[in-house]
Amino acid sequence: MIMRYRAYNAFNKDKSLEILFRPNPVRWMDNFVGNDNPIRDVANWSSEIKFLKDGKISDEIRNMPQDKGGIYMFYLKGPNLPFAEYYILYIGRALYTPSENICKRAMHYLKDERYMIQEMFDNWKNDLYYRYFPDTDNIAIEKNEIALIRSIVPTYNEDIPNKIEELPKVKAF
């Protein structure tokens, strides 16, 4: 009887950590950022950062640029195939303004009160990795965030933005 109880508890604990991933090639292509978009080149992204070290925000996060905005993501990295086993949990953006930048945005996450963000940290805080794509073009930052969220549909992004439709430019007069 004890074995069943323990197995049941282990199963329920495992179940609480399950995450739904939604791979969909049609959605990928429908929200494709374009071959010439610099966000597609891994060399333009930061190196991998372990978000927390010993329960505190890592020095790498604290030392991120304060003169850039950009796109960022929280993800898990599996231990068995660390070169290929990635699970994107959240994608966000930090606009570049006098009061906002990529470093300030990252530092805010431990105090974030949104339910989904709290759940992400409750379940995964010791396993979260972080990468960012620095940028100062706020229009590009917003477009890239929308395209990436719509194509990947990360588990902890509560809102999936509407698609941006760009109409051809026409002369006003």
Predicted regions and their residues:
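Boundary/linker segments flanking structured domains
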Residues: 1-89, 93-173
